[in-house]
Amino acid sequence: MSWRSEQIWIELIPGSRRGSNFVWAFILFFGSLEFILVGTASYFSQNLIAFFPQGMVMIFYGISGLFISLYLSSMLFWNVGGGYNQFDKTRGVICIFRWVFPGRNRRLLLRFFMKDIRSIRIEVKEGFYTRRLLYMDIRGQKAIPLTRTDEVLTPVEIEKKAAELASFLCVPIEVL
């Protein structure tokens, strides 16, 4: 989702709050509860499975699954990776904001001047898992990714996005 005018372009980044992450957290939580229930029932001689070693392993896997589902749920709650990209022509500033894990530096805010942007770069990696990424090259700094690594874009979509951004920022496009 994005909002655009003549002078400002704001692009919202969803982060970890995606439908697939909610589904996996739900499946993992209830699956690990089932593992714990089966392991506990075997301990109390319900004759489902033998407690040693199957019941112990089931309890171990259940507890591990609960910890992983807790981690996934906390990522969803904190919206890790979410934020926005703001391109402001009036002030000549680009702001990239992301939420990260809680702590002293929970907010990640990068600011750059528009005059320091060299180009918008499209990087294509072919192979079994084809990736197309959009970067912003800045003088004296590393390239900053503008798309998520797990975001699958067709060649037409990535070219359109790069062309719109390059024309808005008045910079060239590089393809690697």
Swiss-Prot record:
Pfam families: Ycf4. GO terms for cellular component: photosystem I; plastid thylakoid membrane. Signal peptide: none annotated. It is a multi-pass membrane protein. The chain crosses the membrane at residues 22-42, 48-68. GO terms for biological process: photosynthesis. Coiled coil: none annotated. It is found in: Plastid thylakoid membrane. Its main location: plastid. Keywords: Membrane, Photosynthesis, Plastid, Thylakoid, Transmembrane, Transmembrane helix. PANTHER family: PHOTOSYSTEM I ASSEMBLY PROTEIN YCF4, PTHR33288. Seems to be required for the assembly of the photosystem I complex. Belongs to the Ycf4 family. This is Photosystem I assembly protein Ycf4.
